[in-house]
Amino acid sequence: MQELFITADDRTGALEIGGIVANTQFSVPVGPEAKSDICCVVDTCSRHLHPEEAKRIVFEKHLREARFHCHKIDSGLRGNWPYEIEALNELGHDVALIPSYPDAGRRCDGGVVYIQDVPVLESPFGQDPLTAPCSSRPDEVI
């Protein structure tokens, strides 16, 4: 059984989390159909899809046997992450939502996600024409 299976909603997120995990001294395949006995990251390409389609894809990918399942969301809360998290819940996986990447100036404080000390909705992420977040507070969305 695979130790760690990770999905990400876009290629940059997949490469980002793959690089972080690879820093733990083992190789991490990244791609749409990546496979490994230890850990791999699969890019679901789901950020710009209809929410139900994104949920279906994440659900199907996470049918794979693994000790731990993770889904990397956008730290600016863009995309279909609420639906993708719902897929993990429906599969019986415990979910911890951690919308932060402090090294890039993205953090969650008091339940509000900040980009360079600006609430995400007031940041450039909040102006994304395709996948802007609907709140700076993830708990208001899920």
Give the positions of each predicted feature.
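Cap/lid and interdomain-hinge subdomains that line or gate substrate/regulatory clefts
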Residues: 1-5, 25-31, 53-54, 62-69, ...
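N-terminal signal-anchor module of multipass membrane proteins
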Residues: 2-21
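Active-site flanking residues adjacent to catalytic metal/cofactor-binding acidic residues
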Residues: 8, 42, 99
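Short, glycine-/Ser/Thr-/acidic-enriched flexible segments
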Residues: 11-13, 45-47, 102
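Conserved protein kinase catalytic core
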Residues: 15, 49, 78
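N-terminal glycine-rich anion-binding loops that anchor highly charged ligand groups
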Residues: 26-43
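Short, structured active-site "lid" loops
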Residues: 39-57
